[in-house]
């Protein structure tokens, strides 16, 4: 395929702007769970569709929430 034939990917909608969320708080576990996988890892920006600045704030909030035991740390999962 030539470069001209490639289609541009559709830009993802920002879930934070859609929900009109301006403040990302580490105590808002319901919001933060949308941005972590079932294994407890922080989802990539290309998956969630948030901006660079929002991704940094989300990452910091998730780390703070893990520190105070509101969210689990990413682990291999036993069993």
Curated annotation (Swiss-Prot):
Entries under InterPro entries matching the protein: Ribosomal_bS18, Ribosomal_bS18_CS, Ribosomal_bS18_sf
- GO process terms (BP): translation
Keywords of this entry? Ribonucleoprotein, Ribosomal protein, RNA-binding, rRNA-binding
Q: Which domain of life is it from?
A: Bacteria
A single Gene Ontology MF term assigned here is:
structural constituent of ribosome
Q: Its GO CC terms?
A: cytosolic small ribosomal subunit
Write out the function statement from the record: Binds as a heterodimer with protein bS6 to the central domain of the 16S rRNA, where it helps stabilize the platform of the 30S subunit.
Q: Which protein family is it in?
A: Belongs to the bacterial ribosomal protein bS18 family.
Subunit notes for this chain?
Part of the 30S ribosomal subunit. Forms a tight heterodimer with protein bS6.
Record protein name field = Small ribosomal subunit protein bS18
